Amino acid sequence: MFKKIGIAVSFSPYGKSLFKIAAFLQKELSSQLYLMHIGNFSEEKENRVKALAQEFNIDESAYKIEFKKDEPSKALAKFVETENLDLLILGALEKETTLKYYIGSVARNLMRSAPTNLLICPAKKEADFEFNNLFITTDYSSRSETAIKFL
């Protein structure tokens, strides 16, 4: 199923909820997590990522941390291809400004071109999550069939 799961790590108030989802899936599927932060590397940032992983009881052998400095959509797409990820988890703000609507958001750009399955979660400040509604698009490929069977 999803053996290699990527997560777009941000240090926003919403980042914890994405980590909780990733930790849940990692444990349920015995997957390897690939944690990607867009920005310059620093030990302080790496320690923050490790602290989040530890908070959700993710074993150090179950994840790999990457830092990339590039436009977020491009960096994440390259990351997906380089690591051959089966799933990428990222957050999305529910409300966008008009400017962002026309220029495009990271989530929107990846929905159009990501070479893998995406799990896009609305931003929530609390770490609790529950899936009430799922929206699934398909191109009727074997990859899509695998994702739908997972549900």
Which residues does each predicted region cover?
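Gly/Ser-rich helix-loop-strand patches that form or flank binding pockets
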Residues: 76-127
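Short acidic/Ser/Thr-enriched loop-to-helix initiation segments
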Residues: 1-34, 125-151
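Hydrophobic alpha-helical membrane-association signature
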Residues: 18, 45-48, 106, 147
